[in-house]
Amino acid sequence: ASAAKGEHGGXGAATLRFL
């Protein structure tokens, strides 16, 4: 959940980094 919220807060760049 925390990771999902973090990637969402990044907008897009964070999501790619998370993956």
Curated annotation (Swiss-Prot):
It comes from the Eukaryota. Coiled coil: none annotated. Its main location: mitochondrion. It is found in: Mitochondrion inner membrane. The keyword Zinc does not apply. Pathway: Energy metabolism; oxidative phosphorylation. GO terms for molecular function: oxidoreductase activity. GO terms for cellular component: mitochondrial inner membrane. GO terms for biological process: oxidative phosphorylation. Heart specific isoform. Keywords: Membrane, Mitochondrion, Mitochondrion inner membrane, Oxidoreductase, Transmembrane, Transmembrane helix. It is a single-pass membrane protein. Belongs to the cytochrome c oxidase subunit 6A family. Component of the cytochrome c oxidase (complex IV, CIV), a multisubunit enzyme composed of 14 subunits. The complex is composed of a catalytic core of 3 subunits MT-CO1, MT-CO2 and MT-CO3, encoded in the mitochondrial DNA, and 11 supernumerary subunits COX4I, COX5A, COX5B, COX6A, COX6B, COX6C, COX7A, COX7B, COX7C, COX8 and NDUFA4, which are encoded in the nuclear genome. Component of the cytochrome c oxidase, the last enzyme in the mitochondrial electron transport chain which drives oxidative phosphorylation. The respiratory chain contains 3 multisubunit complexes succinate dehydrogenase (complex II, CII), ubiquinol-cytochrome c oxidoreductase (cytochrome b-c1 complex, complex III, CIII) and cytochrome c oxidase (complex IV, CIV), that cooperate to transfer electrons derived from NADH and succinate to molecular oxygen, creating an electrochemical gradient over the inner membrane that drives transmembrane transport and the ATP synthase. This is Cytochrome c oxidase subunit 6A2, mitochondrial.
